[in-house]
């Protein structure tokens, strides 16, 4: 495999393999680490995370017996929901050892007879035909230079009627920031640098046109783009409140420095979503 297409194991593990117990202190019981969908204002975080998963899966046209590939499967909530609700076979890919081990336990404890696999591997290493693809909160880690390769692979793996649901945070081009009258400050620039160096090493956000153009260039039609921007601000508010409420345990598990870093990250990102510097979108890509 060429060096440029080796999965970014080190970058992903630097964040996601910090400690499962630490993440449990602020995530909901499904351990879903992406934007929730508050379909109703009175939803709990767990209900809203399941609603987000259902929103994504509902766009795929899943039928019993199909095989769903989950690229960046996290701690397995989307995979297991797909098996439970749609009676499909699932394959999950993750670069995180902790996540892979957790999903293996979920699979071992499941009584459902459908095939359920999790691979400690990147999409760059996967080459099996599947019926549908879902990817929630992983695209941000790929790097702009790999978008074409990812869409090309997805197109090749899917059947003629294949669909991929891509859920990713998106950023604005500086020109768009100016056109929308948003302030370009050193504070904003410093925060972005903090995120890509101390929280998500190697992370880069796509713009909406970038996703649409790469999808189209590789044979997909983007049939729908749905923004969940206000939902991510609320999700982050709930995460930071939970982290703060468990401060003593956070510090005991990690350190005060890690606690402060995560509070800065969660509260700062919530503000970025509220102001409009960043967005989160679900792209429905039809082959």
Curated annotation (Swiss-Prot):
GO molecular function, one term: cyclopropane-fatty-acyl-phospholipid synthase activity
Protein name in UniProt: Cyclopropane mycolic acid synthase 1
BP-aspect Gene Ontology terms: lipid biosynthetic process; methylation
Gene field: cmaA1
Catalytic activity: a 1-acyl-2-(9Z)-enoyl-sn-glycero-3-phospholipid + S-adenosyl-L-methionine = a 1-acyl-2-(9-cyclopronane)-acyl-sn-glycero-3-phospholipid + S-adenosyl-L-homocysteine + H(+)
Alphabetized PANTHER family for the sequence: CYCLOPROPANE-FATTY-ACYL-PHOSPHOLIPID SYNTHASE
Compartments in which it is found: Cytoplasm
Subunit text: Homodimer.
Residues annotated for S-adenosyl-L-methionine binding in this entry: 33-34, 68-76, 94-99, 123-124
């Amino acid at each position: 495999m060429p060096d440029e297409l080796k999965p970014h194991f080190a970058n992903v593990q630097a964040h996601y393999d910090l400690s499962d117990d630490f993440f449990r202190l602020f995530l909901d019981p499904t351990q879903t680490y992406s934007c929730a969908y508050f379909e109703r204002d009175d939803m709990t975080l767990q209900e809203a995370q399941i609603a987000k998963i259902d929103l994504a899966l509902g766009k795929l046209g899943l039928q019993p017996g199909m095989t769903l590939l989950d690229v960046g499967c996290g701690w397995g909530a989307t995979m297991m929901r797909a098996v439970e609700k749609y009676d499909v076979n699932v394959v999950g890919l993750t670069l995180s050892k902790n996540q892979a081990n957790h999903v293996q336990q979920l699979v071992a404890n499941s009584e459902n007879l459908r095939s359920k696999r999790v691979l400690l591997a990147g999409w760059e290493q996967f080459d099996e035909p599947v019926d549908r693809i879902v990817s929630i909160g992983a695209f941000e880690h790929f790097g702009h230079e790999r978008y074409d390769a990812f869409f090309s692979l997805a197109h090749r793996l899917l059947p003629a009627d294949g669909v991929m649901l891509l859920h990713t945070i998106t950023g604005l081009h500086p020109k768009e920031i100016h056109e929308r009258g948003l302030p370009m400050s050193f504070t904003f620039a410093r925060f972005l640098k903090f995120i890509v160096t101390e929280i998500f090493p190697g992370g880069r956000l796509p713009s909406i046109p970038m996703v649409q153009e790469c999808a189209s260039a590789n044979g997909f039609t983007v049939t729908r783009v749905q923004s969940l921007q206000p939902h991510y601000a609320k999700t982050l508010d709930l995460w930071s409140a939970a982290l703060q409420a468990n401060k003593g345990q956070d510090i005991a598990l990690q350190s005060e420095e890690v606690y402060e870093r995560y509070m800065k990250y969660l509260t700062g990102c919530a503000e970025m979503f509220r102001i409009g510097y960043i967005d989160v979108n679900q792209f429905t890509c039809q082959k």
